[in-house]
């Protein structure tokens, strides 16, 4: 069956705050479109639902925001049921004497709850508790019942809540988190997918990429609706960018020199100090690509390109302002390399479209076989990529049918393709 056409939205139900409902056949006359979005740099999933209605449900339910929306989608790649969407906004781009078109922007309950004063972070978080435990407790404080996929951190960190929103605090902690295994394994990502919340290190994602690839896609010029093998073909791939030397240099992708000073003790010299270079750290980190160190001219690989001076900020500063160089909280140079990893991960950005596939999620590694004009497989640009952004789109066609695609933005830090692990069983094999 074709992944492009064989989709059904079997249930759409809007429940007002006083229990009134509108659903297909009862207040909702038709569904025009549904867009679903997730990203490894977004703490919440998002969706847009476009419907037609012959009733004035905005006034009759009424709809004012935070109403519950339930959606069930059946597709050959899987059935997905969303039960806890809430309405963030509603617009009415078209209306007539017979029907109206309504567009709902949907968000998650946790995204709303984190804005409330009672859910802001106010307590002191113990500096002896692992960061991963802090992250789990912060999410649970929002009352979430979603699955939490939280990687254990090697370091602990203490801080005060300062009335921060939950997601802001987790992002702040992610930059200071270190993965187990030693070395320069700093830098975590926090995001949400349809299967729950994720908190994972860049290194662990990269190191397991070859064995955790869930799908493999092959570039084609077109897709046939009658050929099942075309369900895993790549349409219209293009690189948004492939390196951006000046911008990356200014954002410390190729190295930095950061000096820290303690505003409480005001020492005569900067301490601690951290210096990193692209060539010096390359072999110490895990990567998605398989090629050796990229050769850069003019000494870019061997010299810091971003110089900065920052105050030392301990999350729970001691009264005398002393810094313990042996503690993870007291040594920002241990986790300052996370900035370089975030930037290197964004070195290549490839956009593409595939037939809709609910087995894909942001943060999953996929294998992409790209072609070189008149030469077949391009082993330089092909290989394992990380899904950065994912958008499922369902549309009503002019003929009244449905078509559905998944738009992807994929990233990686290096070039090269030596083939995926032969022990991996792909979902489409």
Regions found by a protein language model. Name each.
Residues 1-115:
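Assembly/oligomerization scaffold segments
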Residues 1-6, 81-82, 106, 146-152, ...:
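Interface-prone segments of viral and bacterial extracellular assemblies
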Residues 8-10, 45-47, 67, 81-83, ...:
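Envelope-exposed proteins and targeting segments
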Residues 34-62, 218-429:
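An acidic/polar, Gly/Ser/Thr-rich interaction patch typically located in mid-to-C-terminal regions
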Residues 48-50, 106, 117-147, 161-190, ...:
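Amphipathic, non-transmembrane alpha-helical segments in extracytoplasmic/periplasmic proteins
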Residues 52-54, 107-112, 200-207, 411-414:
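Secondary-structure transition/turn motif
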Residues 64-70, 128, 214-220, 363:
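Glycine-centered loop/turn motifs
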Residues 101, 110, 149-243:
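Short beta-strand-centered interaction patches in the first periplasmic/extracellular domains
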